[in-house]
Amino acid sequence: QPSITGDLVSENDLVLLVMPQDIQAPKGRLILPQVQTMRELLDKKCLITSCTTDKLPQTLKALAYPPKLIITDSQVFKTVYEQKPAESLLTSFSVLMAGYKGDIRQFVEGASAIDRLTENSCVLIAEACAHAPMTEDIGRVKIPRLLRKKVGEALHIDMVSGSDFPKDLSKYDLIIH
């Protein structure tokens, strides 16, 4: 049976969820990957605690022992990594969901295509989410900025969302979904 957290944790393991307040989620709500992950951890009989990024130091200090696993949002991964106990594993909700809903080995192999990109390459960024793009949207702003910084400003990037997926993908050197 597919599992979000796989064999990363087992019964009685302490798991810390670091969840910045997502501007996509209405006040008083959590985003679906957070809810699904918490439900699975409860079903596995793990001990779960959560905090926002700004409360991470106080939360770690309040714990009797370091968490086995820390799960956070990709946007604060570096911040959490810099503060986590050395013995705690760290992953993100996005990585867990990618492994749960897709072929994580294929995704890792696909990511290696980034190293082969040149300024003449063509990249497709296909967003499946239906939310309205935000100012610093990861798919429309952050990923293109990082790719152009690595490869060069002339890198051609096409952006599609929802069901607006091109039929012919042959011109693309990399597709990010």
Which residue ranges define each predicted feature?
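C-terminal-of-GTPase-core extension/linker across diverse P-loop GTPases
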Residues: 1-139, 145-148, 153, 159-174
